[in-house]
């Protein structure tokens, strides 16, 4: 058995069953016969012992090798490849080739029929040669008499074997030549066609379809049967065998099938996912071809299934085990019995994923799982059920939203969840909050919960509204669930248990939730003092969840605005917090859903939601306030109502972006508090009670403060108390600190002032808005104002009529603040201006208190305290954003990250110092001290942060860094006052409330930039897309997740504290300080996380720079924060990097140092690399997508920010600098790994992993786990080795093997550090990983790396494919007489309303000629010239040349051929759809262009045909006409804005192609764009596209929203655009609005009629979106939901080139 054959024989064994362990390199080398193997096994222990004993491996190895040499001395002949039958026309040459192995070397004899052929005297008729073990019989100028059975017989001393092939010779007629050969083919094709058509629909929907398919092609089924149970799946292979006929291939297929019997289960599981995917419909055509695949090869079905298995194996297992155990068993049985049947059944639902979207499946699985769980409740059925119940319990709306928006939202939330997962970990609880509430309500304090819920839902008097919020929760829970699935492994039981699932899925969250909400419920009555003393998380949660009903509402309401700012991050937190306060949850969910699922809804219905949310919050606030304090309630209520009104109004204009933020802000404030609380709860379950008490106390204090503030508006003590309270609220996390906070109020205020100075906007405002009730309103108003200021452009409407004065004042304050920290006076004035000046006196008093910190700062600070006075009320809402927020941030951060936070605070303080000046500088430590002391005596930590805190610091540090960056960004934002950027900046960093509001709303886990992008999108109905575009690479997401987890903890604590301090939320600068940890432990974390996470890969130094740039970018995004704040920002950033470096180091110290073994294994490095890659895995898409969205919306902003460009660079860097990043990232990576370790399943698609990681990180166990991870990390047992496929196609197979895969993992292949594909691996799936290199050529030389990573770690192995290595393989056989093919045209019978169907097949023969250039896509496609012999008329005449293109790199799995065929099929089908659909669009464009006088010639996109080559291991390819000349690129996604040819310098064809792009973009409302065109003259090919939504018209792998945005911002109209009357594109912001406007669909009036087709197309799109069908109902909604889908699936789609997608799909 040759080494080559081993793999084909069985991947599992790699050719060697027992020898695998000792010599990694020996596997392929020796493949002994059974006898020798047995002998070897008995001998081996001695060898291995000796090698172990002698610390001299070489001696042991040599002994082992010598033994093997002896054992394998004599083996009987064996055909690695057998003869293939040929059918040729007369005068053609034929070559029969076989590869024979054996020892001694066999002697091969050739026979014609039964006559032996002379080895030496055959010429001129034939020639017998052999090269190595390859034996060839060449026949020249065949005649009919040469038709015969040719046989090769190999013999040696051990035996004799033979194989034969049939030669048919006929005249030049298709019929004669193929009478026999093609009769079979045609029958098969007919059956296949039927199968495809039926399987597309049936396979997905009907598992029983398998039977139908079988009935359709009984032959195949019977063949399978004959093959035997193990080979049952092999029938396709057998089918192929007759055609291509390689025994090895057949066996391999069998093996794969057999191996995949388990896959069936997984597939079955996946099927649910697939169904959930919603990709099924679009993939029907593609998947439908699964039937084709089935027909071609059950192997192919197996392949897709395997892909599913890999991708969702773990998940499937989870689901199967958890929910589908029953199904799984049957499936296993089925798999064993008729794996194919099982697979067919499973593929029917699973196939879409397996076939075309493994990558998507990963994400979708995550996504789908939630959905599936909801529907199925497999692994996460419990959680899902719980969530559903929660949704149902929460409110019908919630349930409704979950069902309808859920899928889309899930996708959207996927992103958020990815980022928020950490937060979300809690949030799922929050989401489940209703559930949790329900669950807890019974066991824990239903009263508290009910009140909370009643308050949030009932009190608001808008259950529906709360439901909205809650509805989003279900979505989030789904997302969470999606991410939870990774956890489900560990938490499968939990999933099963609604509550358990909730608690476990977001372990911390559940725990905190479970504890905190109950505590909250129970503790709602808890005195403020108690509240103060609760754990931060607990406090946050308790505060949010367990304030008095009024307080809760108040907090929620108040928090809502603040949360709005930090809504994203908070959303996650809120999810957790939900149990604490459903109202909070609802807002958060609402925001999340609105942001995500309802991104379109948000825009369209977001206002409603926002209004509802606002209402709820207004009502809730009013009621809550009333409940809490009549006095405060009235003042607050007014404020809140005004704020609420503002919010509700503002949501409409700004709500899409801000509504979620505000609503989310409220909900999120609580959520964040809850999140922080929950996370902290994880950390401090015990403290949770305290926290709850503290929360209560805080709330009570807040309430008291509010009351006191209201009662004693001007009382300094009250102010102080308020301040202190705020601090408490701010440092809800560190309630203990809260008491100290009062003393530190001054310092904190200064700190806040610092923040304010940097982000004066929000800071001053909130104070101004009012004392306590006022401050609450002020907070809301301030938040809004800040948002207005920060989000001014974005949320012009943010200013609510009720609070307009306040807003005005706030804005003024913000402006003043932006101008300088000296806004103290203005702040006071503004405070006075604030409509809610009832506490105005107190405000002034508060201001004086704040003055302690510094004049301006003091003023702001005062405001902060004042706001804090209102912590329960407005403060909570805005505290984060408010000055309090800042202190809270620092304190809250400190509390949140207590140790780390303090450290961060320290750094933050200095950073603030930079921005604010000495007062702040001195105060931050004080503040920190207060915070620290209160929290954990962290003050010392702040200055001399204790190592312990630092241990926690990794996340905190990251958060702080992120926050600092945000702060800088905010200050810049405030300074720039750029609305959009400011919004994000302020929202994200500057004003925690505003910033948090805006960005948070956008994407909890996304960076501010991303958030802003999302916000913009939300406004433009592109939130989902934006989120997707913003999708961080898995790496980034993971980082975000980790950061978010830590920050969520810190953030929740901070939120709790910030919540108290949120009243002053307006202080943008404060936000930075607060942002440091408070802004969003979720958001700042997210934003920072993104930057920081990305930075982390770069390393501490890089982190600093990267972060800086990222932050700067965000800040720039935030609106040209370059102005005043930028100086401090820069400094802060500079400091932050240093700190970051410090902290990362510290964090690293917390993490165990990488051991030499670990380094050797590359586990850590690789971990980071995978992350990097993951980031890159977004592949072009993720980096490009993220970057692109960043670029298009942020491109200008980036320019504003010094580091901005760096951010994309960083992202881009991920693949190229993968190693560097990983090295630098090591610390972070470790953290991430820890998070990942905690995260049950990174495989979930990276997003889940990230979320899971976050959740895991939330656990304090993260570090210990990290330590454990080294042992649990995957290990390499077989390095990459290269083999040749046995079909003489010239294709190579790279494969390697990993073991110790203890959890769901993601396996990534990269070439020269550029990701080319990725597949999921379920826990325990240790089969080989393979990458097929089609028709290997020198173009394919390079360094290939295979990396596997999961939460325990990562491992990778490299291989350099050099020309020398290539030369050792025999290139593709030349002199062939061609190959039989089936060619299928794609027909759009219904125009673009149709996603395309397949026309009648043509059967013919091609002769492949020389290989053309690497083709498009950086070598991802191979193009070769072919000559048509016959059979393709009328499309191609005989003798015509055409071009065959095939994907060059295909990632497949253990059941090699099967999976390989599936990937090959999916990629090829996508290519056909892309080009042919673009051709249809081009036809419409041509019709309109011709109608325009003087337009001239119009480009034409040539059709692409699908061909199937039965004899090829990689059978699917595309065929197109040969344009005769080298292609010229007319437009390319590779061109940057700068690289794009200028209109004047480009050719007419190029200009018209760009006009076509513009027309198409406008015609499809910005949802479809042709990105690449190359051609000759006016004929175009090599089409690449970008869609805004994943699954758009079935195009699953082409979702690149970033490219759409980039095009919108970079396209320069030319004369032809004007000729067609196209509206100039003003960037994505303008474009998206266009997209929103249905009327603007047709760029030209004439187009309206034709526009119907695109619309129907869109309608059709939903089918691809399957699950998202509800979204399609309204265009806006579908867009939003689809983008959400895109987001979730965005990364996989980037694999379009067959890279990542190949594996994922």
UniProtKB/Swiss-Prot annotation:
Sequence ranges of Basic and acidic residues compositional bias: 211-221, 308-342, 647-657, 679-700, 829-844
Modified residues (Phosphoserine): 228, 1222
Alphabetical list of InterPro entries matching this protein: a-kinase_dom, Ig-like_dom, Ig-like_dom_sf, Ig-like_fold, Ig_I-set, Ig_sub, Ig_sub2, Kinase-like_dom_sf
Annotated stretches, region: Disordered: 1-33, 211-244, 308-749, 792-845, 1082-1145, 1173-1226, 1628-1705
GO CC annotation terms, alphabetical: nucleus
Disulfide bonds: 1296-1346
Substrates-to-products reaction catalysed: L-seryl-[protein] + ATP = O-phospho-L-seryl-[protein] + ADP + H(+); L-threonyl-[protein] + ATP = O-phospho-L-threonyl-[protein] + ADP + H(+)
Record's compositionally biased regions (Gly residues): 11-21
Effect of residue 231 to E: In a lung large cell carcinoma sample; somatic mutation
Taxonomy, superkingdom: Eukaryota
Compositionally biased region (Pro residues): 736-745
Enzyme class: transferase
Statement: the UniProt record of this protein carries the keyword Transmembrane helix: no
Domain called Alpha-type protein kinase: residue spans: 1390-1625
PROSITE patterns for this protein: ALPHA_KINASE, IG_LIKE
One MF annotation (Gene Ontology) recorded for this entry: protein serine kinase activity
One Pfam entry name: I-set
Localization per Swiss-Prot or TrEMBL: Nucleus
EC number assigned by the record: 2.7.11.1
GO BP term, pick one: heart development
UniProt biased composition (Polar residues): 495-504, 598-609, 666-676, 708-729, 1664-1696
Function field: Involved in cardiomyocyte differentiation.
Family to which this protein belongs: Belongs to the protein kinase superfamily. Alpha-type protein kinase family. ALPK subfamily.
Disease / disorder: Cardiomyopathy, familial hypertrophic, 27: A form of hypertrophic cardiomyopathy, a heart disorder characterized by ventricular hypertrophy, which is usually asymmetric and often involves the interventricular septum. The symptoms include dyspnea, syncope, collapse, palpitations, and chest pain. They can be readily provoked by exercise. The disorder has inter- and intrafamilial variability ranging from benign to malignant forms with high risk of cardiac failure and sudden cardiac death. CMH27 is a severe, early-onset form with features of hypertrophic and dilated cardiomyopathy.
UniProt name for this protein: Alpha-protein kinase 3
Organism of provenance: Homo sapiens
């Amino acid at each position: 058995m040759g080494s080559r054959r081993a793999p084909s024989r069985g991947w599992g064994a790699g050719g060697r069953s027992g020898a695998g362990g000792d010599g990694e390199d020996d596997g392929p080398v020796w493949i002994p016969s059974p006898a020798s193997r047995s002998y070897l096994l008995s001998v081996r222990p001695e060898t291995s012992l000796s090698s172990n004993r002698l610390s001299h491996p070489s001696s042991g190895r040599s002994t082992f090798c010598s033994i093997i040499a002896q054992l394998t001395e004599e083996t009987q002949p064996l055909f690695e490849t057998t003869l293939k039958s040929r059918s040729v026309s007369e005068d053609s040459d034929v070559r029969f080739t076989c590869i024979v192995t054996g020892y001694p070397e066999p002697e091969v004899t050739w026979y014609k029929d039964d006559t032996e052929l002379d080895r030496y005297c055959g010429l001129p008729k034939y020639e017998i040669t052999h090269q190595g073990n390859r034996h060839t019989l060449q026949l020249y100028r065949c005649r009919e008499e040469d038709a015969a059975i040719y046989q090769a017989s190999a013999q040696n001393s051990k035996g004799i074997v033979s194989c034969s092939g049939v030669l048919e010779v006929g005249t030049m007629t298709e019929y004669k030549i193929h009478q026999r050969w093609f009769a079979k083919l045609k029958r098969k094709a007919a059956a296949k066609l039927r199968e495809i058509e039926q399987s597309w629909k049936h396979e997905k929907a009907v598992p029983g379809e398998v039977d139908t398919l079988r009935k359709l092609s009984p032959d195949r089924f019977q063949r399978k049967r004959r093959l035997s149970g193990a080979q049952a799946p092999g029938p396709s292979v057998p089918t192929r065998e007759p055609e291509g006929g390689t025994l090895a291939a057949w066996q391999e297929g069998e093996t794969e099938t057999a191996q995949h019997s388990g896959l069936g289960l997984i597939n079955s599981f996946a099927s649910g996912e697939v169904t959930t995917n919603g990709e099924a419909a679009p993939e029907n055509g593609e998947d439908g071809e699964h039937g084709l695949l089935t027909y071609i090869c059950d192997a192919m079905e197996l392949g897709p299934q395997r892909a599913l298995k890999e991708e969702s194996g773990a998940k499937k297992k989870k689901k199967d085990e958890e929910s589908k155990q029953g199904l799984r068993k049957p499936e296993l049985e089925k798999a064993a019995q008729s794996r194919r049947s099982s697979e067919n059944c499973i593929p029917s639902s699973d196939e879409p994923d397996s076939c075309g979207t493994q990558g998507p499946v990963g994400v979708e699985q995550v996504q789908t799982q939630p959905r599936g769980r909801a529907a199925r409740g497999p692994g996460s059925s419990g959680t899902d059920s719980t969530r559903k119940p929660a949704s149902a319990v929460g409110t019908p709306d919630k349930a409704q939203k979950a069902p309808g928006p859920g899928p889309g939202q899930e996708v959207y939330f996927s992103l958020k969840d990815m980022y928020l997962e950490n937060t979300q970990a809690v949030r799922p609880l929050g989401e489940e909050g209703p559930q949790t509430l329900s669950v807890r309500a019974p066991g824990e304090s239903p009263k508290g919960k009910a009140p909370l819920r009643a308050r949030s839902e009932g009190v608001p008097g808008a259950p529906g509204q709360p439901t909205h919020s809650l509805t989003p929760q279900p979505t989030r829970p789904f997302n969470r669930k999606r991410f939870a699935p990774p956890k489900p492994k560990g938490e499968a039981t939990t999933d099963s248990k609604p509550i358990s699932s909730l608690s476990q899925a977001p372990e911390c969250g559940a725990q905190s939730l479970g504890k905190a909400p109950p505590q909250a419920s129970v503790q709602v009555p808890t005195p403020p003092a108690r509240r103060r003393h609760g754990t931060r998380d607990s406090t946050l949660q308790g505060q949010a969840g367990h304030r008095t009903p009024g307080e809760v509402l108040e907090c929620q309401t108040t928090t809502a605005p603040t949360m709005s700012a930090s809504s994203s991050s908070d959303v996650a937190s809120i999810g957790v917090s939900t149990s604490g306060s459903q109202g909070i949850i609802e807002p958060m969910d609402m925001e999340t859903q609105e942001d995500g699922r309802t991104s379109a809804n948000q825009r369209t219905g977001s206002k409603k939601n926002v209004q509802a949310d606002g209402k709820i919050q207004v009502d809730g606030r009013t009621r809550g306030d009333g409940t809490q304090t009549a006095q405060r309630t009235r003042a607050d209520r007014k404020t809140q109502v005004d704020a609420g009104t503002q919010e509700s109004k503002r949501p409409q204009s700004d709500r899409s972006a801000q509504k979620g933020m505000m609503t989310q802000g409220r909900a999120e404030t609580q959520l964040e508090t809850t999140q922080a609380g929950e996370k902290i709860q994880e950390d401090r379950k015990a403290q949770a009670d305290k926290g709850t008490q503290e929360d209560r106390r805080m709330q009570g204090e807040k309430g008291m403060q509010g009351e006191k503030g209201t009662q004693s508006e001007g009382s300094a003590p009250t102010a102080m108390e308020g301040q202190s309270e705020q601090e408490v609220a701010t440092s809800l996390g560190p309630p203990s600190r809260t008491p100290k906070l009062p003393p530190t109020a001054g310092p904190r205020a200064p700190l806040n002032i610092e923040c304010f100075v940097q982000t004066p906007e929000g800071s001053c405002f909130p104070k101004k808005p009012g004392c306590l009730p006022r401050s609450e309103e002020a907070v809301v108003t301030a938040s809004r104002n800040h948002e207005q200021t920060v989000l001014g452009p974005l949320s012009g409407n943010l200013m609510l009529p009720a609070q307009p004065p306040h807003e005005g004042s706030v804005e003024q304050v913000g402006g003043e603040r932006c101008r300088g920290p000296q806004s103290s006076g203005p702040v006071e004035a503004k405070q006075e201006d604030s409509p809610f000046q009832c506490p105005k006196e107190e405000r002034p008093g508060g201001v004086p208190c704040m003055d302690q910190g510094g004049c301006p700062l003091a003023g702001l600070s005062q405001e902060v305290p004042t706001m804090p006075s209102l912590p329960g009320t407005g403060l909570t809402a805005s505290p984060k954003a408010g000055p309090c927020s800042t202190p809270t941030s620092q304190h809250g951060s400190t509390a949140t990250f207590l140790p780390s936070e303090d450290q961060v605070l320290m750094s933050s303080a200095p950073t603030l110092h930079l921005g604010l000046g000495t007062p702040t500088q001195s105060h931050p430590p004080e503040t920190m001290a207060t915070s620290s002391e209160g929290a954990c005596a962290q003050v010392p930590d702040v200055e001399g942060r204790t190592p312990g805190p630092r241990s926690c610091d990794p996340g905190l540090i990251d958060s702080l860094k992120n926050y600092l960056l945000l702060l800088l960004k905010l200050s810049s934002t405030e300074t720039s006052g750029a609305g959009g950027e400011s919004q994000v900046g302020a929202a994200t960093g500057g004003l925690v409330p505003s910033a948090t509001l805006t960005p948070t709303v956008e994407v909890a886990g996304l960076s501010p930039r991303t958030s802003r992008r999302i916000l913009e999108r939300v406004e433009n109905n592109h939130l989902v897309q934006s989120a997707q575009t913003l999708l961080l690479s898995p790496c980034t997401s993971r980082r975000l997740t980790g950061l978010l987890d830590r920050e969520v903890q810190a953030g929740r604590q901070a939120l709790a504290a910030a919540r108290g301090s949120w009243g002053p939320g307006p202080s943008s600068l404060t936000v930075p300080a607060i942002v440091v940890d408070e802004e969003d432990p979720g958001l700042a974390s997210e934003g920072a996380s993104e930057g920081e996470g990305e930075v982390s890969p770069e390393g501490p130094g890089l982190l600093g720079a990267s972060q800086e740039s990222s932050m700067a970018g965000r800040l720039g995004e935030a609106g040209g924060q370059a102005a005043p704040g930028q100086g401090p920002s820069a400094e802060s950033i500079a400091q932050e990097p240093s700190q970051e470096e410090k902290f990362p180091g510290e964090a690293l110290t917390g993490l165990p140092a990488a051991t030499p073994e670990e380094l050797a294994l590359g586990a850590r490095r690789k971990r980071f690399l995978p992350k990097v890659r993951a980031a890159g895995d977004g592949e072009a898409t993720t980096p490009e997508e993220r970057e692109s969205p960043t670029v298009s919306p942020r491109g200008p902003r980036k320019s504003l920010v010094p580091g901005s460009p760096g951010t994309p660079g960083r992202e881009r860097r991920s693949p190229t600098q993968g190693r560097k990043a990983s090295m630098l990232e090591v610390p972070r990576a470790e953290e991430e790994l820890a998070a990942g370790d905690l995260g049950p399943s990174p495989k979930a698609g990276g997003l889940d992993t990230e979320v899971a990681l976050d959740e895991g990180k939330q656990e304090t166990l993260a570090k210990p786990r990290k330590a454990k991870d080294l042992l649990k990390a995957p290990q390499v047992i077989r390095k990459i080795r290269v083999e040749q496929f046995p079909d003489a196609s010239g294709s190579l197979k790279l494969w390697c093997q990993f073991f110790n895969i203890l959890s769901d993992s993601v396996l990534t292949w990269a070439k020269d550090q550029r990701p080319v594909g990725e597949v999921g691996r379920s826990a325990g799936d240790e089969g080989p990983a393979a990458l097929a290199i089609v028709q290997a050529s020198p173009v394919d030389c390079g360094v290939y790396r295979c990396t596997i990573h999961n939460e325990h770690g990562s491992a990778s192995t490299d291989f350099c494919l050099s020309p020398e290595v290539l030369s050792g393989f025999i290139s593709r056989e030349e002199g062939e007489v061609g190959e039989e093919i089936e060619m299928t045209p794609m027909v759009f019978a219904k125009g673009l309303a149709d996603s395309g169907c397949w026309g009648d097949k043509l059967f013919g023969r091609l002769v492949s000629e020389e290989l053309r250039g690497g083709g498009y896509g950086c070598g991802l496609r191979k193009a070769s010239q072919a000559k048509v012999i016959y059979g393709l008329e009328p499309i191609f005449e005989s003798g015509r040349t055409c071009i065959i293109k095939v994907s060059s790199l295909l990632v497949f799995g253990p059941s090699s051929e099967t999976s390989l065929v599936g990937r090959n099929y999916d990629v090829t089908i996508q290519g056909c759809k892309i080009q042919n659909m673009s051709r249809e669009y081009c036809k419409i464009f041509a019709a309109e262009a011709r109608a325009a006088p003087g337009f001239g010639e119009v480009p034409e996109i040539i059709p692409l045909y699908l061909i199937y080559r039965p004899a090829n291991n990689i059978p699917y390819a595309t065929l197109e006409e040969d344009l005769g000349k080298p292609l010229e690129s007319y437009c390319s996604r590779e061109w940057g804005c700068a690289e794009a040819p200028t209109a004047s310098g480009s050719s007419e064809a190029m200009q018209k192609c760009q006009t076509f792009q513009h027309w198409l973009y406008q015609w499809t409302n910005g949802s479809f764009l042709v990105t690449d065109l190359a051609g000759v003259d006016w004929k175009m090919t090599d089409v690449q596209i970008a869609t805004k939504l994943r699954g758009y018209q079935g195009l699953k792998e082409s979702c690149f929203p970033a490219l759409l945005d980039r095009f919108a911002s970079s396209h320069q109209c030319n004369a032809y655009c004007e000729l067609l009357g196209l509206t100039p594109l003003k960037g994505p912001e303008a474009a998206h609005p266009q997209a929103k406007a249905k009327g603007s669909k047709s760029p030209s009036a004439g187009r309206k009629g034709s526009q119907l087709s695109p619309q129907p197309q869109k309608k059709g799109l939903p089918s691809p979106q399957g699950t998202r069908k509800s979204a399609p109902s309204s265009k806006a909604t579908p867009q939003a939901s689809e983008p959400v889908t895109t987001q979730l699936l965005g990364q996989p789609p980037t694999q379009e080139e067959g890279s990542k997608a190949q594996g994922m799909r």
